[in-house]
């Protein structure tokens, strides 16, 4: 790719970013758009409507300053530890690429430019130069300047590992601090017990009560048996949906003509429909709750956190297949459809998910091959000779080779996060947070494989096959293929990174949906949705740009300023979104950080493998041998971090649990907490529904037709 094509891509995306910034600064101040750009502040009642109509139409950047103001403590209080972990991931990346950027731009880039392996740089016409002239490919074989790159690789590796250690330790301590500062929660006192053995003449509830009463007599408190309620839940969801429609349906004004016309009995019709649904739901609840209809699983609660932890980690039976225990999620985080599926259905679902992921990976190679075809202008002219005249136009060729490939790849990637979330939901996870973590992990490795490896090895299928059949050649193959795609990934960072981050700020899809809904029906100011943060979509994106920056920092240092600008935009925009848009739906307690840590370690090892292959190709034998221990030390460092910090992420230490239990003895709210703990894990589909059929006619029309408890 020529420098002119990159400049064209940068120019187009810079204009889009400025346009989105201006539009956001104006549209966010319009009252009708508050539900799109400020739903969380509306829900909290912390946003005042503007009285100055003129100021609403003047672009302002005050929101940027406001997004910098909240401290980390305030962010944790409002968005939980997951929000803090996400922002720490971005600040970690900023530190890494500020350090790598200084080395890359001020040291490595000048060294690459003054090489003469390819051709002499045309200083008179910078835009006509190839981007390869700014990469390590411009250095000759056995060039002594390659030792500068060798030193840079060691420096960045040590710097990143030190940062990873301090960040892992910081998040682990924050996890303990968050546990100390939080109020007592049901999941801290509860475990999930599965594979409860059948007992003649006893129900599942009696079996659980007798077993834990005998074996955990000093700590056992209560239990809730789980039922299969998938069919019943669909009926309840329909009733709730109808209730919302009736609740927000505006009453029809009576006119003289309507007074003499046939009576409009819409309210009575809906009330009768809801009453019929209520009756069906009650019958369904009675049927599901009948003896013998239970799932052989239960949520078992204890009087203390230490008692729950002891029961969780201790084998409960001589037969290891019975009384299996695992941590209980938050009550509102439970994925209830998981319990309605049989063992065979779960087993088949896991196999189906594996095949679906493989199929999606294969299908995604189509846009990758298309993208690579667009970046090769001579190949396009050869395959489509009738386009030669159009492709000969400089502006058209720059747009096709510099902007269009990244745009196609960006659009294709939009379907991956929701698809992976759906696949994870049928895989057999007991809570929504586990579904998000599983989807996040799938999206990370899907992106790395299909966007990175499939792109760099897209020359031919036989080329990929030769890499698989001869693993020893992987570093050499990477050293050849990865630098060749440097120009594409620079354009990818500009197109996907910058523009995607700005579209996250502008919330294009919710804005369009809101505009269309207002066009067809009047909007209710009190009816809006506060969305949760979609970590499975945004975390892989940030991590992938981190992988690109680490991999290319010594190969093509020109990518580093664009990566750094992306993380600056991400820092400002995501802080703004946490303040104004997203509200936490659940909190994993920082469990996304190990995933982030392992991905960064993979990025380092990948960079080191490419460096070993590159120095081998450049005939730098001594440098190659000196680099071989580097990935070994990196993996040993990762193992040290895993042994040192991961136990805190899997279980809380005994001293932490006992300290909190002692503090609870002096807490006057604990009796009320224990009363609520008894029913905290009751299935929402089994909660009672009530219609307001009593009272006068006017009361029945003005009061809610259906009331229900929310969990």
Swiss-Prot record:
What is the top-level taxon of the source organism?
Eukaryota
Q: List the molecular function annotations (GO) for this entry.
A: calcium-activated cation channel activity
**Statement: the UniProt record of this protein carries the keyword Cell wall biogenesis/degradation:** no
Q: Name one GO cellular component term.
A: membrane
The UniProt entry, under Pfam families, shows:
PHM7_cyt (PF14703), RSN1_7TM (PF02714), RSN1_TM (PF13967)
Query: Which InterPro entries does the UniProt entry name for this protein?
Result: Csc1-like (IPR045122), CSC1/OSCA1-like_7TM (IPR003864), CSC1/OSCA1-like_cyt (IPR027815), Csc1/OSCA1-like_N (IPR032880)
**Compartment annotation:** Membrane
Topology in membrane: Multi-pass membrane protein
Membrane-spanning parts: 2-22, 89-109, 146-166, 351-371, 403-423, 443-463, 488-510, 553-573, 595-615, 620-640
Arranged from A to Z, the UniProt key words for this protein are: Calcium, Ion channel, Ion transport, Membrane, Transmembrane, Transmembrane helix, Transport
Q: Which family does it belong to?
A: Belongs to the CSC1 (TC 1.A.17) family.
Role: Acts as an osmosensitive calcium-permeable cation channel.
PANTHER family recorded for this chain? ERD (EARLY-RESPONSIVE TO DEHYDRATION STRESS) FAMILY PROTEIN, PROBABLE MEMBRANE PROTEIN DUF221-RELATED
The identity of this protein, by name, is Hyperosmolality-gated Ca2+ permeable channel 2.4
């Amino acid at each position: 790719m020529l420098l002119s094509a990159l400049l064209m891509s940068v120019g187009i995306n810079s204009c889009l970013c400025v346009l989105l910034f201006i539009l956001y600064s104006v549209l966010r101040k319009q009252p009708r758009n508050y539900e799109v750009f400020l739903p969380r502040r509306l829900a909290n009642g912390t946003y005042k409507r503007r009285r100055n109509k003129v100021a609403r139409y003047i672009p302002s950047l005050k929101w940027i300053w406001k997004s910098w103001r909240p401290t980390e403590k305030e962010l944790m209080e409002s968005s939980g530890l997951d929000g803090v972990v996400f922002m720490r991931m971005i600040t970690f990346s900023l530190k890494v690429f500020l350090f790598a950027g200084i080395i890359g731009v001020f040291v490595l880039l000048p060294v690459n430019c003054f090489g003469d392996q390819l051709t002499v740089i045309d200083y008179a016409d910078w835009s006509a130069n190839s981007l390869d002239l700014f990469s390590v490919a411009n250095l000759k074989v056995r060039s002594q300047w390659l030792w500068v790159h060798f030193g840079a690789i060691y420096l960045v590796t040590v710097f990143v590992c030190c940062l990873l250690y301090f960040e892992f330790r910081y998040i682990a301590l924050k996890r303990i601090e968050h546990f100390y500062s939080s109020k007592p929660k049901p999941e801290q006192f509860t475990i999930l017990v599965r594979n409860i053995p059948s007992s003649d003449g006893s129900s599942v509830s009696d079996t659980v009560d007798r077993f834990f009463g005998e074996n955990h007599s000093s700590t056992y408190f209560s239990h809730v048996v789980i039922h299969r309620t998938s069919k019943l839940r669909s009926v309840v969801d329909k009733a709730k949906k109808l209730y919302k429609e009736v609740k927000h349906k505006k009453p029809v004004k009576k006119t003289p003509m309507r007074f003499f016309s046939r009576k409009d009995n819409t309210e009575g019709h809906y009330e009768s429909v809801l009453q019929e649904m209520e009756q069906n739901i009650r019958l369904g609840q009675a049927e599901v709750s009948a003896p013998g209809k239970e799932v052989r699983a239960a949520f078992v609660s204890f009087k203390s956190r230490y008692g729950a932890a002891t029961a969780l980690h201790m084998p409960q039976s001589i037969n290891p297949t019975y009384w299996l225990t695992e941590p209980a999620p938050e009550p509102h985080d439970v994925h209830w459809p998981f319990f309605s599926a049989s063992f065979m259905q779960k087993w088949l679902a896991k196999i189906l998910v594996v095949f679906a992921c493989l199929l999606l990976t294969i299908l995604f190679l189509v846009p990758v091959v298309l993208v690579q075809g667009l970046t090769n202008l001579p190949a396009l002219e050869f395959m489509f000779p009738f386009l030669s005249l159009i492709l000969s136009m400089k502006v058209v060729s720059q747009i096709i080779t510099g902007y269009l490939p990244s745009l196609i790849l960006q659009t294709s990637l939009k379907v991956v996060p929701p698809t992976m979330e759906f696949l994870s939901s049928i895989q057999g996870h007991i809570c929504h947070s586990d579904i998000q973590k599983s989807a996040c992990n799938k999206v990370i490795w899907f992106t790395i494989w299909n966007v990175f490896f499939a792109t760099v090895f897209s020359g031919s299928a036989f080329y990929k096959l030769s890499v698989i059949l001869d693993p020893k050649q992987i570093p050499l193959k990477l050293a050849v293929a990865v630098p060749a795609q440097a120009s594409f990934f620079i354009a990818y960072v500009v197109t996907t990174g910058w523009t995607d981050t700005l579209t996250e700020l502008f919330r294009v899809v919710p804005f369009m949906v809101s505009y269309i809904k207002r066009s067809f029906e009047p909007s209710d100011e009190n009816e809006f949705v506060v969305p949760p943060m979609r970590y499975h979509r945004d975390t892989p994106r940030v991590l992938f740009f981190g992988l690109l920056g680490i991999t290319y920092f010594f190969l093509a240092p020109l990518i580093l300023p664009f990566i750094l600008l992306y993380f600056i935009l991400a820092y400002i925009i995501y802080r703004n979104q946490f303040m104004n848009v997203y509200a936490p739906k659940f909190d994993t307690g920082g469990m996304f950080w190990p995933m982030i840590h392992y991905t960064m370690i993979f990025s380092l090892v990948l960079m080191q493998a490419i460096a070993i292959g590159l120095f081998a190709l450049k005939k730098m034998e001594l440098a190659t041998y000196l680099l071989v221990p580097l990935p070994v030390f990196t993996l040993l460092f990762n193992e040290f971090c895993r042994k040192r910090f991961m136990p805190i992420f899997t279980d809380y230490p005994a001293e932490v649990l006992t300290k909190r239990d002692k503090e609870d003895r002096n807490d006057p709210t604990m009796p009320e907490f224990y009363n609520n703990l008894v029913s905290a894990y009751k299935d929402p589909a089994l909660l009672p529904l009530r219609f307001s059929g009593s009272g006068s006619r006017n009361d029945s029309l003005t009061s809610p037709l259906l009331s229900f408890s929310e969990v």
